[in-house]
């Protein structure tokens, strides 16, 4: 049995290969283009990944810094006492400028307020009954004196009567310091030792106290200062002029004045004076009769004309046979005997002076 040519060729003999065709070349060029595109895409993706990694690292660094700052602040807050309210913001330039502007406005408001307060206190110092060219009252002393002055004037208006000068000055000086009290006493021409109760206790018994029945100022005068609103204000040129007391009882009244008294003529005794009242800007003292003065120092005896002839008549006054010839009030004798010998002599001298 024999094989055909075709079969033998297909089975054993290899067929020769020809040159590559144009289709194969097209396919190979397309594959190269695809590979180049893939490489470019890979490079772009790699660059993008690198950029993202860099940016991510920076963000992570910032986040880490913020976390560290927050941790430090928390540690500081743990060490310090916790503050209530909103957290303090960081100061920027704009905030600093706004803060400075607010402080400047607040300082200006406070400065204007203090200037107005000082001006009002200066006006008040011109009204209160205290004036000195060398000394200036403090703010608290000015307010205290003004309060006492208003209280004293309101008491005068309420009662409708003029109180005693000593009580008026005591009301003015209530709660004031010693320098202010001395200034008030100097303006009213008084000795502060005469109306201070704590000092009256230490005074010797032979010196007259503030409650003495004879007046401190047995005369009338007008002082252009010490007005009360709305009658006027006190000017710095006003000076307080006071006349000295009469010659006959200057020694008895000397403790009430700072300076020694001089001799001068004076009108007759008119009784104690009331506290100063402001009328058209001038202070005047009003004479008032004093029942207490007549009560304390009235020791009267009604003698017949014949009993004053000789010494025998004086000896017979206190005898039993001479009782019908004189009249001696019993209450006056008791009140007179209660005084000491020195006060008895002083009262007798004053009685002789005032009733002659």
From Swiss-Prot:
Q: Which Pfam families does the record cross-reference, listed alphabetically?
A: HLH, Neuro_bHLH
The region called Disordered is annotated at 1-94
Q: Which UniProt keywords apply?
A: Activator, Cytoplasm, Developmental protein, Diabetes mellitus, Differentiation, Disease variant, DNA-binding, Neurogenesis, Nucleus, Phosphoprotein, Transcription, Transcription regulation
The chain positions of domain bHLH read 101-153
Q: What is its main location?
A: cytoplasm
An MF annotation (GO) of this entry: protein heterodimerization activity
Q: Which InterPro entries does the UniProt entry name for this protein?
A: bHLH_dom (IPR011598), bHLH_transcription_factors (IPR050359), HLH_DNA-bd_sf (IPR036638), NeuroD_DUF (IPR022575), TF_bHLH_NeuroD (IPR016637)
On modification after translation, the UniProt record reads: Phosphorylated. In islet cells, phosphorylated on Ser-274 upon glucose stimulation; which may be required for nuclear localization. In activated neurons, phosphorylated on Ser-335; which promotes dendritic growth. Phosphorylated by MAPK1; phosphorylation regulates heterodimerization and DNA-binding activities. Phosphorylation on Ser-266 and Ser-274 increases transactivation on the insulin promoter in glucose-stimulated insulinoma cells.
Per the record, where are the segments of Acidic residues compositional bias?
58-78
Motif Nuclear localization signal positions after renumbering to this chain: 87-93
Indicate where this protein resides in the cell.
Answer: Cytoplasm; Nucleus
Task: Show the ranges annotated as biased composition (Basic residues).
Answer: 81-93
Any one of the GO BP annotations: endocrine pancreas development
A single GO CC term for this protein reads:
chromatin
Q: Which residues carry this modification: Phosphoserine?
A: 162, 259, 266, 274, 335
Q: Tell me, how does this one assemble?
A: Efficient DNA-binding requires dimerization with another bHLH protein. Heterodimer with TCF3/E47; the heterodimer is inhibited in presence of ID2, but not NR0B2, to E-box element. Interacts with EP300; the interaction is inhibited by NR0B2. Interacts with RREB1. Interacts with ATOH8.
PANTHER family the UniProt entry points to: BASIC HELIX-LOOP-HELIX PROTEIN NEUROGENIN-RELATED (PTHR19290), NEUROGENIC DIFFERENTIATION FACTOR 1 (PTHR19290:SF88)
The disorder on record is: Maturity-onset diabetes of the young 6: A form of diabetes that is characterized by an autosomal dominant mode of inheritance, onset in childhood or early adulthood (usually before 25 years of age), a primary defect in insulin secretion and frequent insulin-independence at the beginning of the disease. Type 2 diabetes mellitus: A multifactorial disorder of glucose homeostasis caused by a lack of sensitivity to insulin. Affected individuals usually have an obese body habitus and manifestations of a metabolic syndrome characterized by diabetes, insulin resistance, hypertension and hypertriglyceridemia. The disease results in long-term complications that affect the eyes, kidneys, nerves, and blood vessels.
Function noted in UniProt:
Acts as a transcriptional activator: mediates transcriptional activation by binding to E box-containing promoter consensus core sequences 5'-CANNTG-3'. Associates with the p300/CBP transcription coactivator complex to stimulate transcription of the secretin gene as well as the gene encoding the cyclin-dependent kinase inhibitor CDKN1A.
Name under which the protein is recorded: Neurogenic differentiation factor 1
The species this protein was found in: Homo sapiens (Human)
**Gene symbol?**
NEUROD1
């Amino acid at each position: 049995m024999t094989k055909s040519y075709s079969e033998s060729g297909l089975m054993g003999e290899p067929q020769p290969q020809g040159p590559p065709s144009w289709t194969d070349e097209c396919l190979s060029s397309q594959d190269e283009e695809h590979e180049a595109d893939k490489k470019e895409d890979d490079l772009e993706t790699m660059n993008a990944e690198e950029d993202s990694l860099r940016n991510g690292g920076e963000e992570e660094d910032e986040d880490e810094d913020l976390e560290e700052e927050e941790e430090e602040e928390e540690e500081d807050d743990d060490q310090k006492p916790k503050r209530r309210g909103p957290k303090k913001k960081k100061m920027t330039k704009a905030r600093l400028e706004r803060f400075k502007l607010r402080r400047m406005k607040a300082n200006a408001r406070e400065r204007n307020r203090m200037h107005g307060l000082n001006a009002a206190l200066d006006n008040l110092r011109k009204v209160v009954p205290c004036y000195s060219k060398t000394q200036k009252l403090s703010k608290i002393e000015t307010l205290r004196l003004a309060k006492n002055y208003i209280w004293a004037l309101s008491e005068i208006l309420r009662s409708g009567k003029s109180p005693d000068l000593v009580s008026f000055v005591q009301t003015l000086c209530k709660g004031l310091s010693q320098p202010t009290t001395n200034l008030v006493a100097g303006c009213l021409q008084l000795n502060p030792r005469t109306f201070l109760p704590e000092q009256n206790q230490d005074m010797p018994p032979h010196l007259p106290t503030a409650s003495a029945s004879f007046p401190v100022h047995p005369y009338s005068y007008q002082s252009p200062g010490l007005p009360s609103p709305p009658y006027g204000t006190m000017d710095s040129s006003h000076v307080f002029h006071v006349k000295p007391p009469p010659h006959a009882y200057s020694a008895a009244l000397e403790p009430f004045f700072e300076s020694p008294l001089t001799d001068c003529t004076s009108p007759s005794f008119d009784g104690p004076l009331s506290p100063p009242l402001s009328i058209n800007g001038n202070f005047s003292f009003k004479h008032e009769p004093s029942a207490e003065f007549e009560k304390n120092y009235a020791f009267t005896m009604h003698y017949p004309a014949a009993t004053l002839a000789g010494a025998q008549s004086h000896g017979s006054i206190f005898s039993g046979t001479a009782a019908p010839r004189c009249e001696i009030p019993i209450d006056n004798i008791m009140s007179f005997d209660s005084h000491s010998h020195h006060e008895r002599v002083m009262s007798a001298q004053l009685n002789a002076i005032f009733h002659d």
